[in-house]
Amino acid sequence: MGELRERFDNHMILRGLSPNTRRGYLYHMTQLTKFYMRSPDTLSNDDIQKYLLHLIVRKKQAYDTINQAFSGFRLFYAGLLRRGKTEFHIPPRPKMKKLPLVYPVEDVVRIIDATGNLKHRALLMTTYSAGLRVDEVTRLRPEYIESKRMLIRVDQGKGKKDRYTLLAAKTLQTLRDYWRSYKPGEWLFVGKNPEKPMPIGTAQKIFYKAKKRSGVTGGRGIHTLRHCFATHLIDAGVDVCTVKRMMGHSSLSTSAKYVHVTKYRLSVSGYQLTVS
C-alpha cells in the first residue's frame, strides 16, 4: 500500500483509534490488497463485497474477524477516500455466542510454571493476575506498578478508559525479581528492541509455547488468561460490578457472561451456587 498505508494510519491516529485497532485495520487492508494484487483505491464496492463473502464462505472466519475487516474497509473508503456511502455489507452478529473457555486455576499455574525464563513468567503472571488485554500488558510502564497500594494502573486501555486492577503479592515478588535481573527502562516488557514495547505477536508466542510445554489443551491465545481472571474472581465470590471495573468493561452485560461460565462450571461439577 505504501503511501496509502501511511495516510490511512495517520487518518486513524487523528480519529483517536487505539494502536491495537489501527494494527487490525491495516492488517485487513494489506490482506485485501494481496487478494486482488491491486492498489485498494482501485477497488469497487463489488470487489469489497466479494472479498467479505470470501472471508465468510471460503475462509470461515470468526464473526469478530469479519466485523473488524468490514469496519476497517468502511473507514478506509468512506473516511479516508471520501467515497460517500459504502455499499458492502456483512450479516448481523449471530445471537448465540459461545461462553469463553476458562482453565482451572491449576492449569493456569501449569502454564506459567512452564515458561522458559523469568521475563516470560512475569509477563504471563501479570496478564493473568491483573486480567489484562495483551496490548495492555505489553504497554505497561514500570511506574504503573503501584506496590504501596497493591494496584496496577492500566493507562489508556481499550476505549481510552484508564483504570486500576489488582496487583497480587506473588506477582509483585516476581516483578521485583524480574526488575533486578532485567532492569527494564521505559517499558516494563520489551522484545528485541529495548526502546519499544514487546510486540503483541511475541507475547502470544510466549503463551503458546508455555501452554504447549505444560500439556494444557484447549483455549485460544493469551486472552484466555483474561477470561480466567474474571471467572476465577467470580468463583471466589467477588461481585460482578467489581469485576467490571477491574476488567475495564463499559457494559455490565459483558462482565455478566463470566457469571454464566461460573454457573455452568458448577453445574457440570455437581455443585450448586446462587449468584445474585
Predicted ranges, named:
Residues 1-276:
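Conserved catalytic core of the tyrosine transesterase superfamily
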